[in-house]
C-alpha cells in the first residue's frame, strides 16, 4: 500500500505526518494517538492539552476563538451577523494582521473597523481626513460604549484625529505609542516623503530599519540595470534578512486609497508594513451606459425630468463652463451646487436642497472620488467625453507615442519599434526622461534617441505640409485647433469611477444608476467604448434616443427603496487561488482589474475581484513557485521510501534553495551542502503562507498546471492545508485568459488521485534508478557530477553511437548548389574531392510535373514545436520550452506541454476571426483535428498576430510581466502561423521531377517548385528553383550526420520513451552532467569522452535497466496507473525487485573493477 508522509507537515509539532491524518485535519499520531477521524478544532485542542502535546496548534485555536469573540461583539453592537466579506476581514483582524480593506463604500468597512477597535481595548489611533468624519466616527464609537478621545491624546482610549491635527501635534502622537492604527484614507500619508516618515514613526518603525528599507528599494532599482551583478544580489539578500528580522508591534489598517506608493519612502513603508494600500475596486456596477450626440444639456434635462444628478465637465472646458451650465440648469427650475472643494455641498444634496451637483471630470476631484450619496444620486452626466488632453509637443517626448503617430503618418518606424520593444522598463524611462529634459545619453540609448528625434521632425513636417487636421489611433486622437495640435486620450478610469457614483450599496443590494455622456467628439466615444469593453464584461454604450428612459428612471427610483426586488443582490465569496508561477499569479490578477498586493511570510499575494455570473469572488492569488515538496534525501528507508510488508511509505521534505549557488536540496540544513552559504530559502515559507491564507477564505481553488506534475503539486497543497480548510477544489485551464479562468472556476472539481499516484511512482522510479546509477558512476569515476536515469540512458546511447559513427565516417563533404537545391557528396580524402570538382560537369533535365492538393499541417504539439523551432529558427529545445512557458503564463498561447492536436470550437473561431480581418474569408476551413481529450494543441489565445502583439506591448507596457526578446516574437509567430494555417483550405503544390547528371552520374529528384492558394498565404512551404548554374563548397564532415535536438525529440516520441514535459529536460540533463555538448554553430549534439565512458560502463553492467524496451514498458505502466488500469502497489513491488537486483550487479561490477 502506497502512503505519503510529509516530514514537516504536522499542524501541531511540525514533524512527520501521513496524508490520512492531514486529510482528516488532525495532528500526527505522536501528538494525537488513536483512531484517525474528523474532529472539531476545539476537541483537538482539548485532547492535545490532555495529552500534554500542545504546541503550534494553540495559535490556530486562539485565532479561531478570537474570531468568534469579535463576531459576538459585532452581533451585540450592530444587531446582525457580519456579511461574508466582513467575516473575511475579521478573520484577518483576529490574527493581528496589518492590511488594507479593499471594497466600495457600503460593504461595511467602517463598521468592521469600529467593532474591532471596540474589541481591541488598547491604545488606538483612528486617523480620518476631515473633522466632519471625525465627529461621525466619535459619535458611533460612543454609541457602541467605547472609550473615545476626539481631541486629547489618551492612552487606553480610541484616539480619533485628522491627519492635519497629527502633523500639528506630532510629538504627542508619536509618544502615544498606539498598538492599533487605523487610517481611513491612506492618500493622506502617501502624499509626500515627509508625511510617510511621520506615519512610520507613529507605527514604531525605527530610523535604522526605515533606512534599511530605503536602501533595499534603491538597490533593487539598480539591479534592474545590472541583473547579473552577484555582489548586488547578495547585498539585497542581506538587507532582506535584516528587515525580515524586524517584527512590527503595531497593527496597521487602511480603509481606502486611490494612490499607489511611488516615492522611495512610500515604497519603503510598503515594504515594512507588508502590504500595498489598495485602490477602490470597481467590481460592483449596475448601470445603464447611455450617450447623446452633442452637448445640449437642456435636451438631457428634458429627457430626464428629474433631480438627483451629478454633472461632470471635461477638464479642458474649465470652471467657466461649469458656471455657464449652472446658470442654464437653474433657469430650468433646478437648484445646483458646485462640487469643487469641501463637503458642505454633499450635506445640502443629501438633504434635498440641491438638485444637481456640478464638478470636474477629474479622477482625483472631490466630485468623482469623494462623493457617496446612494439614495439621491441616480444620474451621472458627462459634459464631453472624460479625457486627458496633452499638447502634442509634450506628448512627443514619449517614445511609444512617437512610433504610433509616425506609423499613422506612414513614416517608416519598423526598426525603431523593434529596438524600443526590447528595452527594459528602466531603459525606457531613461530614454523618455532624456527626451523630456534634453539630456545626453550614451551607447545604444543615444542612437535610439537620435532616431526618435529624426522621426519627431518628420512627424511635424508631414502634419504641416499635408495640413492634417485629425489622426485617429486605437487608444488616442490627435486634432488640430487654431494651428496647435493636441493629443486626446479617453479617461476610462474616471468614467468607471464617476459613473459608479450612481450605483451604490443599500441593505446588501446594489442600486441601479444611469450614466449619460454628452458627446463632443464621436471618435473619442468610439475609443472610450473599445477601451471599456476590455475592462467591463459585455460593456456597451446605448443611444439615449433608442432606450425607454422612463423605464430606466423607474428602475433607478425603485432600486433605492428599502425593500425592493429591483436591487441587484450582492453575493460575495472569498477564495484563495493557488497557481505555480509568480508571473501567472500577476497575469491572472491583472486580467480582472488592477489588483492590490500584500506579502504573507515574504510571499507576494495579489487580491483581485472575479465576477462569476451573479457571484463576486474576492480572490487572493498566490504562487507556489513549482513543487513545494520532493522525496526526501534524509536517511529514511530506501532513498526516501520505507519498504516492507507490501507497504511503501514515501517521505517528502520541503525544498530548500541556496541564494548563493542556486542549487536545491531536500535535507534539513542551516547551510547549503554545496557551497556552505547561510542564505537559504525553504518552501516551508510557502506552506506557512498557504495555511495562513486558507484560514481566511471560504474556498480554495488549486490551479497548478494541467498535467501529471501539476496534479502532484495540487495534491501536496491540498494535503498540507486540509487541517485549516476543507473546501478545496481543483481547477484546470489550458489558457490564461479571462474566459479560460472563468470556465475553470465554473467547472471546479476534485484532484485526480490516479494521476497523483502515477507521478509518485515516476518520481520514486526516477529516484531509485537515478541514485543507484549515479552512485555507481561516481564510485567508478571518482567524480561528483555524474548521474543517469531510465530515460537519459537510451538517449545517451543514441548520441554515443551516432557520435562514434560520425567519427568513423569522417572525411570531406562537397556541397554542389544547383540554384537553391544542394546535393551532397562524400570523399575520404581532399584530393579526390578536388579532382571531382576540376572535371565537374552538370546537366539537368525536367522530366515531368504534377500538381497535388496538399492539406496544411496540424497545429503544434510539444514535440513538433521543438522540432520546428530548431529546424526553422535554430533555437534549442530548452530555450523554446522557457519561451513557451513565458508565452503561456502571459496568456498568449494555450498550455505548451501537450501531445494533442485537437482544436476547440473557441480555437476555430479565433482563426475564423483573424482570416476575416485579413479579408481571407474564402480561405477558411475549420478543423478540430485530433479527438477531444485532456489537452488542446498549442495555439494562440486570440486573433492577435505578431505585429498586433507588438502594438499591444507598446500600448500596454504594464500588461505583460515578462521581458520580450526577438526569440519570444519568433516563437509566437511560428505558433500563430502554423495554427492559422491549420484552419485554412488546402494549397496547390506543383512537384517537378528532375534528372540530374553530375560527371555522368545520374540522379533523379522530385521537388516542390510552386505553391499557391489556401494555407500557403499564411504558412508557405519551402519550394525550389533548380538551375544548371552551380557553385561548390568543400568542408570537413561526415557522411553520418550528428543528431539535432529535433531528431532526438522525434526519436523519443516515436519510441515512446519520453513525455512532453521531459523532452527538453532529458537533453539538458545529459549536457549538465557533461556527457553531451552542443556544437557552437549548428547546436548539434556530440557525446563527450566522459559520456562515452559512462554509457559503456552502464551498458556493461545494467543494460536492461537503461534499454529502450524496459524504459518504454515502465512508462506504459505509469500511464496505466494514471488511467486507473493498474494497481500502483504491484508496479512498485516489481520496480523495487528489479532495482535491488541491479544494485547487487552494480556492487559486484565495482568490486571487479577495483580488483583489476
Curated annotation (Swiss-Prot):
Gene Ontology molecular function terms on file: ATP binding; ATP hydrolysis activity; DNA binding; DNA topoisomerase type II (double strand cut, ATP-hydrolyzing) activity; reverse gyrase activity; zinc ion binding
ZnF locations on chain (RG N-terminal-type): 1-38
EC number: 5.6.2.-
Keywords for the protein's UniProt record, in alphabetical order: ATP-binding, Cytoplasm, DNA-binding, Isomerase, Magnesium, Metal-binding, Nucleotide-binding, Repeat, Topoisomerase, Zinc, Zinc-finger
Residues where Zn(2+) 2 binds: 658, 661, 672, 675
A Pfam family per the record: DEAD
Domain of life from the UniProt record: Archaea
Domain spans labelled Helicase ATP-binding: 90-277
InterPro entries with a match to the protein in the record: DEAD/DEAH_box_helicase_dom, Helicase_ATP-bd, P-loop_NTPase, Reverse_gyrase, Topo_IA_2, Topo_IA_cen, Topo_IA_cen_sub1, Topo_IA_cen_sub3
Toprim domain segment(s): 574-736
Functional description taken from the UniProt entry: Modifies the topological state of DNA by introducing positive supercoils in an ATP-dependent process, increasing the linking number in steps of +1. Binds to single-stranded DNA, transiently cleaves and then rejoins the ends, introducing a positive supercoil in the process. The scissile phosphodiester is attacked by the catalytic tyrosine of the enzyme, resulting in the formation of a DNA-(5'-phosphotyrosyl)-enzyme intermediate. Probably involved in rewinding DNA strands in regions of the chromosome that have opened up to allow replication, transcription, DNA repair and/or for DNA protection.
Further facts: This enzyme is the only unique feature of hyperthermophilic bacteria/archaea known and seems to be essential for adaptation to life at high temperatures. It may play a role in stabilization of DNA at high temperatures.
Official protein name in the record: Reverse gyrase 1
Gene that encodes the chain: rgy1
Amino acid at each position: 500500500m502506497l502512503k505519503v508522509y510529509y516530514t514537516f507537515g504536522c499542524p501541531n509539532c511540525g514533524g512527520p505526518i501521513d496524508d490520512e491524518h492531514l486529510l482528516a485535519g488532525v495532528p500526527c499520531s505522536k501528538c494525537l494517538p488513536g483512531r484517525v477521524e474528523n474532529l472539531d478544532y476545539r476537541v483537538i485542542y482539548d485532547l492535545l492539552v490532555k495529552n500534554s502535546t500542545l504546541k503550534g496548534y494553540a495559535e490556530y485555536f486562539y485565532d479561531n476563538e478570537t474570531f468568534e469573540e469579535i463576531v459576538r461583539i459585532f452581533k451585540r453592537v450592530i444587531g446582525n451577523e457580519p456579511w461574508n466579506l466582513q467575516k473575511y476581514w475579521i478573520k484577518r483582524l483576529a490574527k493581528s494582521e496589518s492590511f488594507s480593506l479593499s471594497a466600495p463604500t457600503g460593504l461595511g468597512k467602517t463598521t468592521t473597523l469600529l467593532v474591532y477597535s471596540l474589541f481591541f481595548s488598547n491604545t488606538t489611533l483612528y486617523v480620518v481626513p476631515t473633522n466632519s468624519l471625525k465627529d461621525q466616527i466619535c459619535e458611533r464609537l460612543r454609541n457602541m460604549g467605547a472609550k473615545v478621545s476626539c481631541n486629547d491624546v489618551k492612552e487606553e482610549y480610541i484616539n480619533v484625529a485628522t491627519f492635519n491635527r497629527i502633523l500639528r501635534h506630532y510629538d504627542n502622537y508619536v509618544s502615544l505609542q498606539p498598538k492599533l492604527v487605523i487610517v481611513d484614507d491612506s492618500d493622506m500619508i502617501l502624499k509626500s516623503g515627509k508625511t510617510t516618515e511621520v506615519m512610520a514613526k507613529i507605527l514604531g518603525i525605527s530610523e535604522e530599519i526605515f533606512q534599511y528599507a530605503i536602501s533595499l528599494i534603491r538597490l533593487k532599482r539598480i539591479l534592474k540595470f545590472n541583473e547579473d551583478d552577484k555582489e548586488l544580489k547578495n547585498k539585497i539578500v542581506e538587507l532582506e534578512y535584516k528587515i525580515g528580522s524586524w517584527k512590527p508591534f503595531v497593527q496597521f489598517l487602511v480603509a481606502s486609497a486611490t494612490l499607489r506608493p511611488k516615492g522611495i519612502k512610500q515604497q519603503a513603508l510598503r515594504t515594512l508594513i507588508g502590504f500595498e494600500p489598495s485602490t477602490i475596486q470597481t467590481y460592483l456596477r449596475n448601470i445603464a451606459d447611455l450617450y447623446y450626440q452633442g452637448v445640449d444639456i437642456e435636451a438631457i434635462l428634458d429627457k430626464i425630468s428629474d433631480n438627483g444628478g451629478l454633472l461632470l465637465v471635461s477638464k479642458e472646458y474649465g470652471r467657466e463652463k461649469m458656471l455657464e451650465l449652472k446658470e442654464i440648469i437653474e433657469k430650468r427650475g433646478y437648484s445646483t451646487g458646485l462640487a469643487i472643494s469641501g463637503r458642505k455641498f454633499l450635506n445640502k444634496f443629501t438633504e434635498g436642497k440641491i438638485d444637481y451637483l456640478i464638478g470636474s471630470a477629474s479622477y482625483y476631484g472631490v466630485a468623482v472620488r469623494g462623493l457617496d450619496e446612494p439614495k439621491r444620486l441616480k444620474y451621472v452626466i458627462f459634459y464631453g467625453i472624460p479625457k486627458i488632453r496633452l499638447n502634442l509637443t509634450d506628448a512627443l517626448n514619449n517614445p511609444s507615442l512617437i512610433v504610433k503617430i509616425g506609423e499613422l503618418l506612414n513614416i517608416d518606424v519598423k526598426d525603431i519599434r523593434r529596438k524600443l520593444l526590447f528595452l527594459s522598463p528602466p531603459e525606457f524611462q531613461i530614454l523618455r526622461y532624456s527626451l523630456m529634459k534634453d539630456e545626453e545619453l550614451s551607447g545604444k540609448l543615444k542612437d535610439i534617441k537620435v532616431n526618435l528625434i529624426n522621426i519627431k521632425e518628420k512627424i511635424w513636417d508631414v502634419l504641416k505640409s499635408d495640413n492634417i487636421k485629425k489622426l485617429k489611433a486605437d487608444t488616442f486622437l490627435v486634432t488640430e485647433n487654431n494651428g496647435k495640435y493636441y493629443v486626446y486620450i479617453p479617461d476610462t478610469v474616471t468614467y468607471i469611477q464617476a459613473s459608479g457614483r450612481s450605483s451604490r450599496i443599500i441593505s446588501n443590494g446594489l442600486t441601479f444608476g444611469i450614466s449619460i455622456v454628452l458627446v463632443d467628439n464621436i471618435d473619442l466615444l468610439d475609443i472610450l467604448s473599445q477601451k471599456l469593453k476590455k475592462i467591463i464584461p459585455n460593456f456597451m454604450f446605448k443611444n439615449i434616443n433608442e432606450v425607454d428612459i422612463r423605464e430606466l428612471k423607474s428602475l433607478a427610483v425603485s432600486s433605492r427603496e428599502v425593500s425592493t426586488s429591483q436591487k441587484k443582490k450582492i453575493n460575495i465569496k472569498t477564495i484563495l487561488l493557488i497557481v505555480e508561477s509568480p508571473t501567472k499569479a500577476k497575469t491572472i490578477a491583472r486580467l480582472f482589474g488592477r489588483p492590490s498586493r500584500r506579502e504573507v511570510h515574504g510571499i507576494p499575494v495579489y487580491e483581485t475581484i472575479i465576477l462569476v455570473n451573479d457571484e463576486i469572488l474576492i480572490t487572493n492569488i498566490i504562487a507556489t513557485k513549482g513543487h513545494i515538496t520532493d522525496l526526501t534525501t534524509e536517511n529514511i528507508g530506501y532513498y526516501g521510501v520505507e519498504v516492507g510488508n507490501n507497504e511503501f511509505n514515501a517521505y517528502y521534505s520541503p525544498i530548500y534553495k541556496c541564494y548563493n549557488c542556486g542549487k536545491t536540496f531536500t535535507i534539513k540544513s542551516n547551510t547549503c551542502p554545496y557551497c556552505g552559504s547561510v542564505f537559504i530559502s525553504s518552501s516551508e515559507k510557502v506552506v506557512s503562507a498557504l495555511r495562513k491564507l486558507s484560514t481566511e477564505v471560504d474556498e480554495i481553488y488549486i490551479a497548478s498546471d494541467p498535467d501529471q506534475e501539476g496534479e502532484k503539486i495540487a495534491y501536496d497543497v491540498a494535503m498540507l492545508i486540509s487541517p485549516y480548510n476543507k473546501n478545496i477544489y481543483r481547477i484546470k485551464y489550458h489558457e490564461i485568459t479571462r474566459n479560460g479562468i472563468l470556465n475553470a472556476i465554473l467547472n471546479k472539481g476534485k484532484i485526480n488521485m490516479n494521476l497523483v499516484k502515477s507521478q509518485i511512482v515516476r518520481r520514486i522510479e526516477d529516484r531509485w534508478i537515478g541514485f543507484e546509477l549515479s552512485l555507481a558512476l561516481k564510485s567508478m569515476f571518482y567524480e561528483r557530477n555524474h548521474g543517469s536515469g531510465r530515460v537519459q540512458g537510451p538517449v545517451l546511447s543514441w548520441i554515443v553511437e551516432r557520435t562514434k559513427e560520425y567519427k568513423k565516417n569522417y572525411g570531406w563533404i562537397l556541397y554542389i548548389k544547383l540554384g537553391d537545391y544542394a546535393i551532397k557528396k562524400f570523399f575520404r580524402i581532399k584530393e579526390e574531392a578536388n579532382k571531382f570538382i576540376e572535371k565537374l560537369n552538370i546537366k539537368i533535365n525536367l522530366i515531368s510535373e504534377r500538381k497535388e492538393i496538399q492539406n496544411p499541417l496540424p497545429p503544434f504539439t510539444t514535440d513538433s514545436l521543438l522540432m520546428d523551432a530548431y529546424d526553422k529558427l535554430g533555437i534549442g529545445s530548452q530555450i523554446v520550452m522557457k519561451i513557451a512557458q513565458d508565452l503561456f503564463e502571459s496568456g498568449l498561447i494555450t498550455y505548451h506541454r501537450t501531445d494533442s492536436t485537437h482544436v476547440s470550437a473557441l480555437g476555430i473561431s479565433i482563426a475564423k476571426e483573424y482570416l476575416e480581418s485579413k479579408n481571407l474569408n474564402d480561405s477558411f476551413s475549420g478543423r478540430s483535428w485530433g479527438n477531444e481529450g485532456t489537452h488542446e494543441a498549442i495555439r494562440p489565445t486570440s486573433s492577435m498576430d505578431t505585429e498586433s502583439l507588438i502594438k499591444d506591448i507598446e500600448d500596454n507596457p504594464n500588461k505583460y510581466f515578462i521581458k520580450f526578446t526577438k526569440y519570444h516574437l519568433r516563437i509566437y509567430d511560428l505558433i500563430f502561423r502554423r495554427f492559422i494555417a491549420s484552419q485554412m483550405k488546402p494549397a496547390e503544390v506543383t512537384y517537378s521531377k528532375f534528372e540530374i547528371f553530375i560527371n555522368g552520374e545520374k540522379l533523379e529528384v522530385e521537388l516542390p517548385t510552386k505553391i499557391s492558394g489556401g494555407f500557403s498565404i499564411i504558412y508557405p512551404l519551402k519550394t525550389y528553383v533548380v538551375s544548371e548554374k552551380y557553385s561548390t563548397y568543400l568542408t570537413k564532415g561526415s557522411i553520418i550526420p550528428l543528431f539535432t535536438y529535433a531528431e532526438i525529440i522525434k526519436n523519443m516520441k516515436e519510441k515512446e520513451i519520453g513525455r512532453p514535459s521531459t523532452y527538453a529536460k532529458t537533453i539538458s540533463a545529459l549536457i549538465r552532467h557533461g556527457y553531451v555538448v552542443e556544437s557552437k554553430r549548428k547546436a548539434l549534439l556530440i557525446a563527450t569522452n566522459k559520456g562515452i565512458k559512462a554509457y559503456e560502463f552502464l551498458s556493461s553492467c545494467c543494460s536492461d535497466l537503461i534499454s529502450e524496451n524496459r524504459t518504454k514498458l515502465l512508462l506504459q505502466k505509469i500511464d496505466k496507473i494514471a488511467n486507473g488500469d493498474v494497481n500502483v502497489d504491484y508496479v512498485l513491488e516489481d520496480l523495487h525487485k528489479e532495482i535491488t537486483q541491479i544494485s547487487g550487479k552494480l556492487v559486484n561490477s565495482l568490486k571487479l573493477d577495483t580488483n583489476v
